[in-house]
Amino acid sequence: MNLSFFDQFSSPCLLGIPLILPSLLLPALLLPSPGNRWINNRLSTIQLWFTHLITKQLMTPLNKAGHKWALLLTSLILMLLSINLLGLLPYTFTPTTQLSMNMALALPLWLATLLTGLRNQPSASLGHLLPEGTPTPLIPALIMIETTSLLIRPLALGVRLTANLTAGHLLIQLISTATIALLPMMPSISALTALILFLLTILEVAVAMIQAYVFVLLLSLYLQENI
């Protein structure tokens, strides 16, 4: 059966049932749950240290009212980080390459930050649409520009995550295909492409981590504007 490069981005099905939900729940099963023991193992210690580091980075720009979002934002970045990294394994499906899933995460969370600002401080939230000192003739145009910029924020969040991961997966598949195809004909060139593939894989690991961090960091900055 002939497969295209984009078949890796289609959700697998078992008996007609999409397996995207189990693939989202699998990373949570791989994380060790803290026990009641006095001494934790090394993996639990590293996980706790990493969670505290992420929470500190995300909560630093927020005031005390925004700290109630700590559990949601920390859980979100851990989920995205786990899914992105597991998606780099061979023959695995990466749910975060689906724009529908990323938009399903970005749109409600962005809307929650916006509604929080409109409920708690409506004047300050609407004031972001018109910077202070704007000349009177530019007020209508600037309000339209700022409103458009506000409304495309969830789209930018979802498209950024989808595009970066999809491009990385396609590059890895293209270079790995070229490495296998060149191996019997030009072994030296195949070795060079294999080295490029190794470096690209390291880069994609960094991209997977950075994109998860950027997604949640931008949400925390949007929350900072509305608290």
Curated annotation (Swiss-Prot):
Subcellular location: Mitochondrion inner membrane
Topology versus the membrane: Multi-pass membrane protein
GO-annotated biological processes: proton motive force-driven ATP synthesis; proton motive force-driven mitochondrial ATP synthesis; proton transmembrane transport
GO MF terms held by the record: proton channel activity; proton-transporting ATP synthase activity, rotational mechanism
Protein keywords: ATP synthesis, CF(0), Hydrogen ion transport, Ion transport, Membrane, Mitochondrion, Mitochondrion inner membrane, Transmembrane, Transmembrane helix, Transport
Record SUPFAM superfamilies: F1F0 ATP synthase subunit A (SSF81336)
Catalysis: reaction(s): H(+)(in) = H(+)(out)
Matching PROSITE patterns: ATPASE_A
GO cellular component labels: mitochondrial inner membrane; proton-transporting ATP synthase complex
Family matches, as InterPro entries: ATP_synth_F0_asu, ATP_synth_F0_asu_AS, ATP_synth_F0_asu_bact/mt, F0_ATP_A_sf
Annotated transmembrane regions: 12-32, 69-89, 98-118, 139-159, 170-190, 196-216
Protein's job: Subunit a, of the mitochondrial membrane ATP synthase complex (F(1)F(0) ATP synthase or Complex V) that produces ATP from ADP in the presence of a proton gradient across the membrane which is generated by electron transport complexes of the respiratory chain. ATP synthase complex consist of a soluble F(1) head domain - the catalytic core - and a membrane F(1) domain - the membrane proton channel. These two domains are linked by a central stalk rotating inside the F(1) region and a stationary peripheral stalk.
Assembly information from the UniProt record: Component of the ATP synthase complex composed at least of ATP5F1A/subunit alpha, ATP5F1B/subunit beta, ATP5MC1/subunit c (homooctomer), MT-ATP6/subunit a, MT-ATP8/subunit 8, ATP5ME/subunit e, ATP5MF/subunit f, ATP5MG/subunit g, ATP5MK/subunit k, ATP5MJ/subunit j, ATP5F1C/subunit gamma, ATP5F1D/subunit delta, ATP5F1E/subunit epsilon, ATP5PF/subunit F6, ATP5PB/subunit b, ATP5PD/subunit d, ATP5PO/subunit OSCP.
PANTHER family found in the cross-reference section: ATP SYNTHASE SUBUNIT A (PTHR11410:SF0)
Family: Belongs to the ATPase A chain family.
Protein's name according to its UniProt entry: ATP synthase F(0) complex subunit a
Species: Gallus gallus (Chicken)
Source taxonomy: Eukaryota, Metazoa, Chordata, Craniata, Vertebrata
